[in-house]
């Protein structure tokens, strides 16, 4: 179903409510990574160019008690956004009431306002997170049209996305549009061959994704901690490696269903301890010593995965290949990241989270077609689930 995008709306002289994802990491009141703010700029700038009034709002962290408010204000975000836009961003330190309403009424065309953390509404009965209908209706009453550009929360039905959209004409912002196009494209209509690379620690986190992608992808390459549950399902010794014992039968079923579509590592980098200081070495996947644990894929697996990627037209990657925060066990993730980045004739997509962080740390971000801004949202999209934040946007 085609959704309206911001370019479909008449924005001149309009009060434009914009749900952005400014859930940025902070330390001592300072923003440590402003990627999410930068990602929202095209939508905000377009609204201002069209002489709309931009009324922005976002959540920041979890807020359950008054004490939780400490360090969760969006004030530093307003200051950073103002620097990035090169113009004043009016900050309103509340989520409802006369102060906010007056500030919106006084807003002129081409001006920007950011109001306080939407999750401050969660202190009294989780009104934001539980999509309180009165709150959604109230926020909707503050604007003429609604633009949802927060893909990172699209898998949640909150008052600030679904609640407003059910009361007001709405459209996707440019970032949301891009996410629907690329992440949705993997599920709906990928250029083939489609190769999925899935990593991370737990099978339980990725079951839905593996099941769905086995029906869509030409190959599914599996790395990371969840590998060992699959190896155990094949009757291999995995030593002290991470094992989800209650998921072995399920892994067995997935292996049977997948046939040669599912590709597992052929070697592992092992150590006796989960530490960067402990000695480590590489062994073949079927001979992990009883007193050691696998913490990364080895070079033979990097080579195998690189070979499987050749000729792919669409690649989607979600989850690291090993404990990449420890440098001794980061080579698998780096190797896979490089292999995908070097593909010249493919649409390459990273499904957010740790993989996105890895690509950025390695300086490969610009080598990928699309890096998703939503970890949980992109995973649920890849599972084939309908995302409430997307479904609630007006159809064209």
UniProtKB/Swiss-Prot annotation:
Pathway in which this enzyme or protein is active: Carbohydrate degradation; glycolysis; pyruvate from D-glyceraldehyde 3-phosphate: step 2/5
Keyword Cytoplasm appears in the UniProt entry: yes
SUPFAM superfamilies found in the cross-reference section: Phosphoglycerate kinase
GO terms classed as biological process: gluconeogenesis; glycolytic process
UniProt xrefs under PROSITE patterns: PGLYCERATE_KINASE
Lineage top rank: taxon: Bacteria
Broadest EC class assigned to this enzyme: transferase
Catalytic activity from the UniProt record: (2R)-3-phosphoglycerate + ATP = (2R)-3-phospho-glyceroyl phosphate + ADP
InterPro entries: Phosphoglycerate_kinase (IPR001576), Phosphoglycerate_kinase_CS (IPR015911), Phosphoglycerate_kinase_N (IPR015824), Phosphoglycerate_kinase_sf (IPR036043)
Keyword set, alphabetical order: ATP-binding, Cytoplasm, Glycolysis, Kinase, Nucleotide-binding, Transferase
Subcellular location: Cytoplasm
UniProt-listed Pfam families: PGK
UniProt EC number: 2.7.2.3
Principal location: cytoplasm
Family designation: Belongs to the phosphoglycerate kinase family.
Protein name: Phosphoglycerate kinase
